């Protein structure tokens, strides 16, 4: 994924991680996973509940936070 593609993704996932926001992650096959984002990189998200699961980003359809998240995007206009 290019840097432009991650201008929203990385700050969003990082805010969820830093603020320990509970999330529901829906996979492309319809399965719902719940937990807290522990870490992430270009390809995977580590989701923690009773255990830590490594979820591949290409399998994720939607990430739904349990509450609103404040994003601070420094370089919005490019």
UniProtKB/Swiss-Prot annotation:
Keyword RNA-binding annotated:
yes
Named from the GO MF annotations, one term is: RNA binding
* A Gene Ontology biological process term: regulation of translation, ncRNA-mediated
- Sm domain ranges (all copies): 10-69
Q: What is the gene called?
A: hfq
The record's function comment reads: RNA chaperone that binds small regulatory RNA (sRNAs) and mRNAs to facilitate mRNA translational regulation in response to envelope stress, environmental stress and changes in metabolite concentrations. Also binds with high specificity to tRNAs.
- Check the UniProt entry and state the signal peptide residues, or none: none
| UniProt cross-references to HAMAP family, sorted A to Z | Hfq
Transmembrane annotation, as ranges: none
Q: Does the keyword Cell cycle apply?
A: no
What the record says about family reads: Belongs to the Hfq family.
The record's listing under Pfam families reads:
Hfq
Q: What is this protein called?
A: RNA-binding protein Hfq
Q: Which NCBIfam families match?
A: Hfq, PRK00395.1
Q: How does it assemble?
A: Homohexamer.
| Keywords for the protein's UniProt record, in alphabetical order | RNA-binding, Stress response
Which InterPro entries does the annotation name? Hfq, LSM_dom_sf, Sm
GO cellular-component terms in the record? Answer: cytosol
């Amino acid at each position: 994924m290019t840097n432009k593609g991650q201008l929203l993704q990385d700050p969003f996932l990082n805010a969820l991680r830093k603020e320990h926001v509970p999330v529901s992650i829906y996979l492309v096959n319809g399965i719902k996973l719940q937990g807290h984002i522990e870490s992430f990189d270009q390809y995977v998200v580590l989701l923690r509940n009773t255990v830590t699961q490594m979820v591949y980003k290409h399998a994720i359809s939607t990430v739904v936070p349990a509450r609103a998240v404040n994003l601070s995007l420094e370089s919005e206009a490019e």
